[in-house]
Amino acid sequence: MLLLCGLLPCFCWAQHRSITDAESIVEKFVLTHPKISKGNNIKYHPLSKDKSIETNQEHQPYYIFSDDAERTGFVIISGDERMPEILAYSEDNSFNVDNIPPNVQYWLDCYAEAFSRLSPAASTNRQSVSLSTTHEVQPLLEGNSWGQGDPYNRLCPSYNNERCVTGCVATAMAQVMAHYRYPAIGKGSVDYRTLTNNIHVTRDFSKDEFLWGDMLENYKTHFTEIQAKAVSELMFSCGASVKMDYGTSSQGGSGAYQTSLVTAYINNFSYDRDMACLFRNHCSTEDWHAILMHELDEGRPVNYAGQSLRDGGHSFVLDGYKTSTNSNYPDYHVNWGWNGTCNGYYQIANLAPAEDGQQHTADGFNSSQQMVVGTMPEDGIDNHFRFLCTSNLHTSSSKVKNGSTIQVYTASLVNSSYKETNGTIAVTLTNSEDTTETIIADTYLKSLGYQQEQRNYSLNITIPSNIKEGQYQVELRYHHTGTNDYQKVFSQQYPVITISDSGEDNPTDDYYAYLGCSDFELASTTGDSIICIKLYELQNLIEDPFIGDIRMILANNQGKALTVFGDSIQPDEMGMHEIVEEPLSIQGCLTGDWENGKYRIYIGARRINQQSYTNISFYDITIPQGEYKDFYFEADIVDGKMMIDGKTFPIIPSIIQDTSYHLTNTANNVIYSLTGTRQSSLRRGINIIRGKDGRMCKIFKKNK
């Protein structure tokens, strides 16, 4: 939930809040919320050390105040003045610090992580945009206090004589369906085995008749067997539809992917086909809140999810909002799906903005948040809208001349909607002074299905020669075939370029790729043409994000590059100083006729707009900070074979003109053929030089 916070511009010295400061804030807050203080028993409850993320700070990231006597009302105060004062509150529900639901603990972890990322710098002088509103939406699920245990899980499978819990995704889904009391009956079926416990799950949804009238808003006290059966039937159907990986409470519960909700709602329960599942790191703060508020304004509860640092993903429902007294973004009402515990209003705005006022996402919380939009019964109307999203959008130049050409690119263009795309992509330039919008570079977009992406997407655009000088925000637009509208393609940030008649083109600063790794090794075996190199802890060493590819480079003994070879690896976009935790393997075969001698093999990285590859550096704690050195393997080529670290790799010879080549398996059966007139085919075919039995395929030539 580290989104851009709606703080007013201010000039002050930053300081942490003490418990005394927090108590003073609570005293003022309850004066305007009398239901919280009616028992006069609201007090501070410290958390045990294992309940929050280690912040390495003397002060608390937040302070929890609750009314234990009346069991009504709580307030959570932030631990730093740069965060909103009130992080969460409720006038109706309790907050037991000794029994915090996992979903709520996730939220508290996010608050603590935001607190830990606050710079000790004193100045909080910055200005941020806001999305203020005077409108409110009362909780749409008001009264619903469902959970994951009994009686909700009575039809869930058992494991080791213990009944599995429903799972937070299923409970949240059931709550939304209960809001609509729809459908009357399901459709389709499912048959699968769970990943963790290998439990066989089967369900024929066409036989499900949902008895909405028999379901209670809560099952805390008395209920009949009929009422219990009605809600447990719904819960199991929801879980099976998202292919729930069922587990017991002692195992940590049951889990499912949030993205599965969209297909389950539509395919098994006849919900609207215009639904979508959006990721937080694909939207700006303003867009994210605008979409979320619009859904709630339309009376549609929102299935929301986040990723915990300690125990995986969590799903719950946002079902209302009201104006915040201490933030320019609303307080959202959260139903945690935990028998009503801790339900209340919570801040989901950026709790720890960067010192420059900009929005950063290296923390990972933004990227882990998701929401399902458009959830409602099928209305039979195709609105032709597609939620197309990108990771960060970039331009190759920040200052350009009229009539010049630049590139607009992103690491990934994703279709977040259930319906596939069918149309074109355009670039718009919006003047920051008079909001004049110019549409250019309308190009075809290949069809993308639900959650499908096009990697390393780029467009070359020519700046109109007659466009007015000034600053322009660059955005993408999607034009659906058969419509007249250009729909916004969402991005977490939109680049700004300066256009002038006489100015020189200014490529983006430090445009070359600068990557490093902590260690590397040769992972291949001798006798195989395929060279495989593993990189450990690959890191982007500069502030600019890395979007591009990585390949092997053959150089002479002085380090001059001779050729690139092998697979082109395209890692996910790497943010400022981001580290890839998993080892990265790069492999391929060297082709050609090379003279005997000494050579080097480097690993090179190339950003999407970069013409040549930059050697990846080797960094280690023994090397002074800011100093890096290239790494490479020394290699010897002798009679068509390359020797690296005592291992031998046959080199695939160059294609000779007017010669046919065939790749064969060990039985000498031809499995691929190529000619000397199509050298590129050899490279495309490199990955099939292994036979089905895994052995090296033979290569022979035959004169025409």
Place the predicted regions along the sequence by residue:
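Active-site-adjacent substructure of cysteine-protease-like catalytic cores
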Residues: 43, 48-71, 263, 267-335, ...
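Noncatalytic regulatory segments and standalone regulatory/sensor domains
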Residues: 18, 22, 26, 30, ...
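Bacterial Sec-dependent N-terminal signal peptides
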Residues: 1-19, 243, 265
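Residue-level detector of functionally pivotal "anchor" positions at catalytic/ligand-binding pockets or at interdomain
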Residues: 367-390, 508, 650-678
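Short beta-strand elements
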Residues: 482-518, 609-652
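Active-site-adjacent structural segments surrounding the nucleophilic cysteine of cysteine proteases
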Residues: 86-253
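Contiguous beta-strand segments within globular domains
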Residues: 394-424, 454-460, 521-549, 583-585
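C-terminal outer-membrane/trafficking sorting elements
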Residues: 10-11, 652-704
